Amino acid sequence: MASPAPLTVERLGFAWPNGRTALNHCSFQIPKSGLWMLVGSNGSGKSTLLRLIAGLLTPRSGQIHTPLKAALVFQNPDHQLLLPSCSSELLLALPEGLSSSERSDRIHTALEQVGLSGLAQRSIHTLSGGQKQRLAIAGALASEASLLLLDEPTALLDPSSQADALELVHQLSHRTEQPLTALWITHRLEELQRCDGAAVMEEGHMGPWQSGQALIQQLAGQLAPLQSGRAEG
């Protein structure tokens, strides 16, 4: 028997209190684990979609189906890192009912998975931006989430930290045992080269999945006339 799709969204609709529609009959499916990316202009509904999947917002219509626990990773990790040390931050994410040794083991494993071994007692304010983003991902892993929702996680990082964060999520979503499913919003077209599928969101609708390289070429073709016009003008 085939495993259920990690995520299925059916005719999802959402409007803000001011009446502005953010999503309108948005439907798509992530067919398997891996790294899946969304691009789109500001206001196209990308971030709203992630918050609906994470359960932070309630849809006006439609359904979300997933057998996985979801966790949202924000653009700015300072918005979700609340406690003074790495270990105390991860304690917030752990399931209830664990023994002291189980909590310690879970924290150690989560930090090891994101390349932060040995930093359990490190003060969060001493971490670099890239390390903070890794810690935010470690919190998702410690919570036993296997559906990562990443809202432009590299937007505030330097190029080296950006590449490291992308490689980390790529590895976690392609590991042999229990690979994660990651839905990643980006404005950096070069990041699409690492994904298993990419799609464009426009006016609350999501287009079909295609390869990252194909989408790069499509978007480059759309931008070329605009750039040419600016040069001529």
Predicted feature locations:
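Conserved ABC ATPase signature
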Residues: 123-127, 131
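A short, flexible loop at the N-terminus of ABC-type nucleotide-binding domains that lies
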Residues: 1-25
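Conserved beta-strand-loop-alpha-helix hinge in the C-terminal portion
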Residues: 205-232
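The feature captures the beta-strand-to-loop junction immediately N-terminal to the Walker
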Residues: 39-41
